């Protein structure tokens, strides 16, 4: 559970995030750093190298879509399970995504935020975001239990 101060820090910081850029980089990095996650995206075309993944327009578009959903979830920090219920159902029952991938993506997102915002992404802001991405990963994994 986040305090009111932590919620304000996360939502305030998120307003600075370009979801197109950060989403593309986060999903691309996930697919490069954890190549076994590529099996869910084989229909995206060329994922044969880091350069191919990072430049792939389908990866970029889906990364934006992922962060659009994350952005929507930030509006419901007190009910992440409710906010992500439909996506949890989809990823569990239809797509059969390993729920560990949600945790991996959350951690990659934190890395990308740190890379893009440098000193502005302070240890305290990181701590707040780590709580949020853990909560989102838990919410997305909810239908698996």
From Swiss-Prot:
The modification S-nitrosocysteine is found at residue 92. GO terms for molecular function: haptoglobin binding; heme binding; hemoglobin alpha binding; metal ion binding; organic acid binding; oxygen binding; oxygen carrier activity; peroxidase activity. The modification Phosphothreonine is found at residue 11. Residues 1-145 form the Globin domain. Keywords: Acetylation, Heme, Iron, Metal-binding, Oxygen transport, Phosphoprotein, S-nitrosylation, Transport. SUPFAM superfamilies: Globin-like. The modification N6-acetyllysine is found at residues 58, 81. The keyword Phosphoprotein applies. InterPro entries: Globin, Globin-like_sf, Globin/Proto, Hemoglobin_b, Hemoglobin_oxygen_transport. One of its GO terms (biological process) is hydrogen peroxide catabolic process. PROSITE patterns: GLOBIN. Heme b binds at residues 62, 91. Red blood cells. GO terms for cellular component: blood microparticle; haptoglobin-hemoglobin complex; hemoglobin complex. It comes from the Eukaryota. Belongs to the globin family. Involved in oxygen transport from the lung to the various peripheral tissues. Heterotetramer of two alpha chains and two beta chains. PANTHER family: HEMOGLOBIN FAMILY MEMBER, HEMOGLOBIN SUBUNIT BETA. This is Hemoglobin subunit beta-3. The lineage of its organism: Eukaryota, Metazoa, Chordata, Craniata, Vertebrata.
């Amino acid at each position: 559970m986040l305090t009111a101060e932590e919620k304000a820090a996360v939502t305030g910081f998120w307003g600075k995030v370009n979801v197109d850029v950060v989403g593309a980089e986060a999903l691309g990095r996930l697919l490069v750093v954890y190549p076994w996650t590529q099996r869910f995206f084989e229909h995206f075309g060329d994922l044969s190298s880091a350069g191919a993944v990072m430049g792939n327009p389908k990866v970029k578009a889906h990364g934006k879509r992922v962060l659009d959903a994350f952005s929507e979830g930030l509006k419901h920090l007190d009910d992440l399970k409710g906010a992500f219920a439909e996506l949890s159902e989809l990823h569990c029952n239809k797509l059969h995504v390993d729920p560990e991938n949600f945790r991996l993506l959350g951690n990659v997102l934190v890395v990308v935020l740190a890379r893009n915002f440098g000193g502005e992404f302070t240890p305290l802001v990181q701590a707040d975001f780590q709580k949020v991405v853990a909560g989102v990963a838990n919410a997305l994994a909810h239908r698996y239990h």
